[in-house]
Amino acid sequence: MGMRPTARMPKLTRRSRVLIAFALVAVLLLLLGPRLIDTYVDWLWFGELGYRSVFTTVLATRLIVFVVVALAIGAIVFAGLALAYRTRPVFVPTAGPNDPVARYRTTVMARLRLFGIGVPVFIGLLAGIVAQSYWVKIQLFLHGGDFGITDPEFGKDLGFYAFDLPFYRLVLTYLFVATFLAFVANLLGHYLFGGIRLTGRVGALSRAARIQLISLAGTLIVLKAFAYWLDRYELLSNDRSAKPFTGAGYTDINAVLPAKLIMLAIAVICAVAVFSALVLRDLRIPAIGVALLLLSSLVVGAGWPLIVEQFSVKPNAAQKEAEYISRSIEATRHAYGLTDETVTYRNYENTGQTTAAQVAADRATTSNIRLLDPTIVSPAFTQFQQGKNFYYFPDQLSIDRYIGPDGNLRDYVVAARELNPDRLIDNQRDWINRHTVYTHGNGFIASPANTVRGVANDPNQNGGYPEFLASVVGANGSVISPGPAPLDQPRIYFGPVISNTPADYAIVGKTGDTDREYDYETNTETKNYTYGGKGGVPIGNWLNRSVFAAKFAERNFLFSNVIGENSKILFNRDPAERVEAVAPWLTTDTSVYPAIVNKRMVWIVDGYTTLDNYPYSELTTLSSATADSNEVAVNRLAPDKKVSYIRNSVKATVDAYDGTVTLYAQDENDPVLKAWMDVFPGTVKPKADITPELQAHLRYPEDLFKVQRALLAKYHVDNPVTFFSAQDFWDVPLDPNPTASSFQPPYYIVAKDLVKNDNSASFQLTSALNRFQRDFLAAYVSASSDPETYGKLTVLTIPGQVNGPKLAFNAISTDTAVSQDLGVIGRDNQNRIRWGNLLTLPVADGGLLYVAPVYASPGSSDAASSYPRLIRVAMLYNDRVGYGPTVSDALTELFGPGAGATATDVAPAEGRPAQSTPNGQQPAASPPPAANADGRPAQAPPPPSAATPTGPVQISQAKAEALQDLESALTAAQEAQRSGDFAEYGQALQRLNDAMKKYDSAK
């Protein structure tokens, strides 16, 4: 019986065709409309920032990849179908009137164009959509260069693994998928059109079907052979759980690698066997070849390596893996910037008893002991510096350093007083108010981290609050900028807080003759402002207004009269997100901080270039390696991204006023950065363009440091056998604070310069490391942020059993005097006691000092109204506890008179801290000031003149001699006490008293 005549499709009426056309257009608009709107908005936004070349390069790359892959995959699938159709048998017998294949064949023939063209088009489009997301690999392949370092196994430059190998694997994957889809399409086509018949005892296979299917099957095997070849190189970055390191181990090199070559040879032989069926017309040979390939993959590819691993490697693992562990140690150190050029190890052992004079002489550290914990004092900033309900400080503040009035380096707790739209109330939430009136924050607030205003000897006394330096727009419209650096423009239109709400846009620009944006208040009126920065996308024309109305689903863009021809819209206001948008190849640090640079407020963002296939380098997950108690507390975690290479290659700044993004090359030797600078020329400025003012505020980034300290815990070990046994590993300590739930965070401090190893002050990022699975200290790590030694890591290795952070905190918190005093403050005076960050500080010669500030806040909650103040300072040195209201008191209790001679002075307090408010009003928590004679409320009284917190100072010759006398008198008193000579002891005490008087009177 022949083929049935094809049934014709019923004709559609004109009305039906019109309705279908309208429906298709509506669906396309729903699918493509938002994408087209976003594309146009991005085109405007990138152009406003000056990075339109980034947008066009990425868009063009994605489009080209999409078109090429879609056409290639679609064409291959179409060819498989077309060949099956063109070579179909003329006569196709059927199994009867109910033959299901015949019914399917009839359906396909009736809709031949739909199936013959629609299916390949759909598959091609789907493949193109997936492929365009790999534009990064394609651009790196096109622009990547050499590392100048070769791998230890194949001798290939590391640029091959970073830039070439991922592209080859991508191409091979798509060729394999395309060939497989063509095979399936061809197989189904021949089955439907009669080239393959399964009826009868043996079935039938047409010559055309045999040739086409065998050709495609052979091609798949050839591609598999190429895959085996590439698998060899990928062994160098594999992370099998059986190994304590990343990369190829003994089993991989001596079993898996030869197995890959054997499998490659078998695949080639099988491909020849399969192609031979084109001539021999015997399908048993290719079937045997395919079976051989499958069997070999089980026996050679899996069985042999398993036998080698179990019976050769495991009984002698330390010796067998030693060579490969050495490779991993060297590669990991280079990939994460932990080579000898960067890291200096020094033995740090306390060789004698530390004296008061030695501690006092270590003035770079003792004069800068940090008292303000940026994770605790935010409520105090809010209480005394908020000013208005819609201003806000983040829960965790930042640390930066500036040169103090005395010319010495000093660290500050810094914060920008940003606008928080979520805190607007009642009518303030109206669309006009939210987006055109309340548009910006106002003020840069800094507090010296090493001092507080006043001493709280008694819990009922005022004192212990931060000393605020507020750069704000004052009541007369002029900028008040007392420090820590001059600031010309304190208004903040861009920042992480202001952007942390849905639809964070602001509409700015003058409409008419009046200013609309809220700025500040005088005693009698509210003053408004009009944004004058260059940032913002113009929305004065109806096209842009319509586009943004659609983007934000807000009709007021079309109907509100507050939008005029000079109006602009500010959006995408998060600094880190702006950097990631203009540099999509960067991973940004989770910590973004404000700084005053050249009289402008900028947000500084650290950017990383990363790889995940660096040969033999440890594979690390950023989210787990960077997690600590601070990150967990605010749910600010790094991306869940695996890396085996990382560089802080870019420093970025985002202007807080106009949103300008500037990228600077920090590591110009980074091959990954060089590749991206070739992809996007002109977007990254050279390192030489970093001004000294900006360089003075660049910090060693936290996330990079946390990744490095986690790796240093293992990769400080040189001996591969010791590495394998893990007997000399270290651990990142848990945060000992009772409210913490993760690892102890690193801390920025100003202290003695460990790179230069002298008494000069240095801004550094520090962390302690414990012994493996023990609470004793193993090492102290410091990363320098000073311009001349930036990026240098110093590791002090600590012998013996020195208390780690947990043991130190337990010793302090359980000390009888400490617990009793805090019990009185907390229980009897109804205060909530909070322990601040436990700092570990190298002091004197080989000594380690633990310092923990203690805060008290009214009530028992963490509410913003329960603002904390410093109530005590607790210290531990060896097994001795020092405790008191001030640093000087605690040092004196630990080391004796004179130890706190160079410690931070306390700023005098007259009640609570000065409350700088730009609008001339008192914060809500403060009592209202008395009225003036005319009945108007008086302005807040000016803050009392506070003594400048003392930074590291140069001691005069007279004071140095007095310190020597102090040390001599202390030594004599201790010797007399041990010998029981009370007469000599009394004389020594008198000399000590005289030495103290001499020190106090010395100039």
Swiss-Prot record:
Q: Which InterPro entries match?
A: UPF0182 (IPR005372)
Domain of life of the organism encoding this protein: Bacteria
Q: Which cysteines are joined by disulfide bonds?
A: none
Q: What is its main location?
A: membrane
Membrane-crossing segments per the record? 18-38, 63-83, 114-134, 176-196, 211-231, 260-280, 288-308
Assigned GO CC terms: extracellular region; plasma membrane
Q: Which Pfam families match?
A: UPF0182
Does this entry carry the keyword Cell membrane? yes
What's the protein's topology in the membrane? Multi-pass membrane protein
Q: Where is this region: Disordered?
A: 902-960
Keywords attached to this Swiss-Prot or TrEMBL record, sorted alphabetically, are: Cell membrane, Membrane, Transmembrane, Transmembrane helix
Q: Does the keyword Cell membrane apply?
A: yes
Subcellular location, in the record's words?
Cell membrane
Query: What family is reported?
Result: Belongs to the UPF0182 family.
Recorded protein name is UPF0182 protein MSMEG_1959/MSMEI_1915
Q: Which organism is it from?
A: Mycolicibacterium smegmatis (strain ATCC 700084 / mc(2)155) (Mycobacterium smegmatis)
